[in-house]
Amino acid sequence: MRLALLYHQFITRGGLEGYLMEFAGHLKSAGHELVLVTSRINDAMRDLADEVRIIPPAFTSRGTLAKFAARSAEIVPGLRVDAVLGFGRTWRQDLHRAGGGCHWHYSRMLPWWKRLRPKNQLELALERRLYTGGGTRHFVVNSAKVKLELAGAYQVPPERVSVIHTAVDSQKWQPAATPEIRQALRRQLGIPEGVPALLFASLDHRRKGLGTLLPALAQTPEARLWVAGQSLDAWQPLIQKLGLTDRVTGLGRADLLPWYQAADWFVHPTHYDACANTVLQSMACALPGLISAADGAVEFLREGGNGTILQHPGDVEELATKLRWALGLSGAERRSLGLAARETVLPLTWPAHLAGWEAAWGQSQ
């Protein structure tokens, strides 16, 4: 098939962009031709494309979102393709994947002044047009949670929404081959001998719950925390106030694989996530997780069986209690949870993911 993919930036940035790069690569390997409609594109994505259509960006990110949505809607009817797949704030395509979840639902959790920001209002308006404007045949989401949210917010009929879980490359994301290799990796990464290592990964620390994790960490003095992704500069006053300067280390945009393999727990007290890639990746690496119930990925969690669930992500005391429980497990118990987590996500293969898209395309006809 000749497929058009709509998204305003095909670049290396966050979870959605990473997914799109892998998705495009697997589509190409399956023999499909790709037309990419975008405002920004990196060389790797350009190399995968049979055709690239550029919509010049505006001067601001908000302007780019609005311009891309409007211009792509004009371009779509003239694309000589078999199907158009959208991934952002676009409203005209055959199938649309809401990788970030339901913005209306997330927006309700923001402070009032953030809800009133022009960009937030624009995103809400574009999302409403997507789900109520009639320009899209079928919707794809990555968790059952998001399907329910769309039904509640926009009355999207369930038969128009397919849940296709994100694929996880279990050959790439896998545990260290032996305990000895894992110990050597811990030494290489600077994890002190005998110190429980907690991993937190985020490009939006406020939304992902770092503000809850830091005070909870202060109640569990035996552990140290490594934070990957966004800078910790804005969080240093709180870190210092809590006396955590020597126990919290920022990694920047580090390669997560060695940290998944070396850490003892992945801690993810997010306030909202559709289905975080980091949760699935850490599970594939046999790293047990303490995962927020506000993440759609918890449909893969079995309490005490392959991880543990934080029911109230903003509750410092609950998180501290969960951390103490997690750190109280023996090494053998922790490893058992991790191996069970890996077994849980092994069925999430790319062939299964592409088959889900094919089924969704069939439903849209």
Predicted regions and their residues:
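Membrane-proximal helix-turn-helix segments that form the acceptor-binding/catalytic region
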Residues: 119-142, 148, 153-154
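Short alpha-helical donor nucleotide-sugar binding micro-motif in glycosyltransferases
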Residues: 253-254, 258-263
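Conserved acidic donor-binding segment of nucleotide-sugar-dependent glycosyltransferases
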Residues: 303-304, 308-316, 325-331
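Nucleotide-activated donor-binding/catalytic signature segment of Leloir-type glycosyltransferases, i.e.
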Residues: 236-253
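A short, well-ordered alpha-helix in the C-terminal region of glycosyltransferases
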Residues: 184, 332-347
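Aromatic "clamp/platform" in nucleotide-sugar-dependent glycosyltransferases that forms part
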Residues: 271
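A conserved mid-protein helix/loop that constitutes part of the nucleotide-sugar donor-binding site
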Residues: 17-22, 196-219
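Short hydrophobic beta-strand element within catalytic cores of glycosyltransferases
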Residues: 288-292
